[in-house]
Regions:
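Juxtamembrane intracellular "pre-TM" segments in multi-pass secondary transporters
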Residues: 2-23, 205-255, 433
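Helix-loop boundary and gating motifs at the non-cytosolic
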Residues: 16-74, 248-285
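Transmembrane alpha-helix termini and helix-breaking/packing motifs in multi-pass membrane transporters
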Residues: 49-54, 165-185, 384-400
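Helix-to-loop junctions at the C-terminal end of transmembrane segments
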Residues: 76-88, 174, 296-309, 393-394
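Structural signature of the two symmetry-related core transmembrane helices
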Residues: 92-106, 189, 311-326, 406
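Helix-loop junctions at membrane interfaces in 12-TM secondary transporters
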Residues: 107-120, 328-339
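Intracellular juxtamembrane helix-capping segments at the cytosolic ends
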Residues: 130-143, 349-362
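C-terminal membrane-cytosol helix-exit motif in multi-pass small-molecule transporters
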Residues: 190-214, 412-420
Length: 433
């Protein structure tokens, strides 16, 4: 057997074996995301209704609030990721971010103006910005390279299962008259606090497979690059130690362009209402979307470990473009139901593989910073994406706005296929092929 044929045969052998169980960190972080999304998705599908009917906010105003909220989170994503690399401590930032969101989110229940909702949403997303990159880096650190897609897929599936249960709780509470809207928002403090307790008591800084990669890389460094006690300077000053590389930056540029099509999903809920879906069924529609997201996320992430990230991401982005074209042409309530279900496949096929590809392209010592840049790019794009979509909707109609989003997604898909490389060299080093 030649050296050239050994790696592919080894990959085939690994793919035929049962998957090893995921480590506790991944499972607990998945549970935390489940609880957080239960709380978040009780609120989110009802927020457009609350803003438009209770506070009288227009489509452009909705886009402004959600755009600022998502972009505000980007202010902390990069420095949080960088700091978690610098200190090699992910958990404190993850706990802080989830705590801020858990405390801020219920306050929507006492908001009396659009400005107050904006402040609350910005605080909520600011917490998300603090936690996201360190959490993703912690997941990547906790598993071997050939389990990354699966780990991120399971994490996204748990997140989406929470997003199924949250709207169902909201629908049940409101339908049965157990509480009015503002009281329901206040109740979201309960799952938020429970998620923080899980983090504090059960998640540990990792010393797993990816940490071993970093120790091996550090051991290979010249003695002149270590301090008197032995730790490599790369661990202490990762920002200047290892470049992220051109392939990573090309991926980031294309993801930023695609993210300009990612206006807030609140517009999809408004479009569904416009097409005739009743307010009582909006939470059920939102839950149905997340059933598809949850079931497809675990499959999509794991499949990307076997067939590669590129086919899954391209397929997901293509579905996104087609769904937006569908919303532009839709004219009946059942169109909204069908499009929401197909829309769930986009998330399942692309979210986990995108994050796994970021981890593939980033050196182990820079994963926190890499996820910081990735999440910052998506967050920064959210503001112009949502504001532009809302303005186009108000001036030229929903059909034009959705067509614009589909066009941006289509162009981004073509660019992804042309300029984003398959990370073959690093995949071989980490045992992926």
């Amino acid at each position: 057997m030649s050296a050239k044929t050994a790696p592919p045969q080894a990959a085939l052998l690994r793919s035929a074996l049962p998957r090893p169980p995921l480590p506790r960190n991944v499972k607990i972080l998945a549970a935390v995301s489940f609880l957080t999304d239960v709380a978040s998705e009780i609120t989110y599908p009802l927020l457009p209704l609350f803003l438009s009917t209770v506070l009288g906010v227009s489509a452009a105003g909705l886009g402004l609030i959600e755009g600022f909220a998502e972009s505000a989170s980007s202010l902390m994503r990069l420095p949080a990721g960088w700091w978690s690399d610098r200190t090699r401590r992910r958990k404190p930032l993850v706990v802080l971010g989830y705590t801020i969101a858990a405390l801020a989110r219920p306050l929507i229940g006492v908001a009396q103006s659009a400005g107050q909702v904006l402040l609350i949403r910005v605080s909520d997303r600011f917490g998300k910005g603090i936690r996201t990159a360190p959490r993703d880096a912690l997941i990547a650190d906790s598993v071997a390279a050939d389990q990354r897609g699966y780990a991120f897929g399971i994490h996204r599936a748990s997140d989406n299962l929470g997003a199924v249960l949250g709207p169902l709780i909201a629908w049940g509470v409101l339908t049965l008259g157990l509480a009015e809207l503002r009281t329901l928002f206040l109740w979201t403090a309960l799952p938020g606090i429970l998620s923080v307790l899980l983090l504090v008591f059960f998640v540990r800084e990792t010393h797993g497979p990816a940490a071993t990669e970093q120790r091996l890389a550090s051991a290979a460094m010249p003695k002149s690059e270590t301090d008197a006690n032995g730790p490599p300077l790369a661990v202490l000053d990762v920002a200047s130690a290892v470049p992220l590389g051109a392939p990573f930056w090309r991926l980031l540029a294309v993801i930023f362009l695609f993210s300009l099509s990612l206006s807030t999903d609140a517009f999809l809920l408004l479009r569904a209402s416009q097409l005739g879906v009743s307010n009582a069924l909006i939470p059920i529609l939102w839950a149905a979307l997340h059933v598809v997201k949850a079931s497809s996320s675990a499959v999509g992430g794991g499949l990307s470990d076997r067939v590669g990230r590129r086919p899954l991401i391209l397929g997901g982005w293509g579905i996104y473009a087609l769904v937006y074209l569908g919303f532009a042409a839709a004219s009946a309530p059942w169109h909204a139901w069908a499009l929401f279900l197909v829309y769930g496949l986009y998330f399942g096929m692309s979210e986990g593989p995108e994050k796994a590809l970021v981890a593939d392209l980033a050196p182990p010592s820079r994963r926190g910073a890499a996820f910081g840049w990735f999440n910052a790019a998506v967050g920064i794009a959210a503001l112009p994406a949502s504001i532009l979509f809302g303005v186009v909707w108000d001036r030229w109609g929903a059909e034009t706005a959705f067509t614009m989003g589909a066009a941006i997604a289509g162009v981004s898909s073509v660019l992804f296929a042309l300029v984003v490389p398959v990370p073959a060299a690093r995949a071989v080093r980490e045992g992926q092929v």
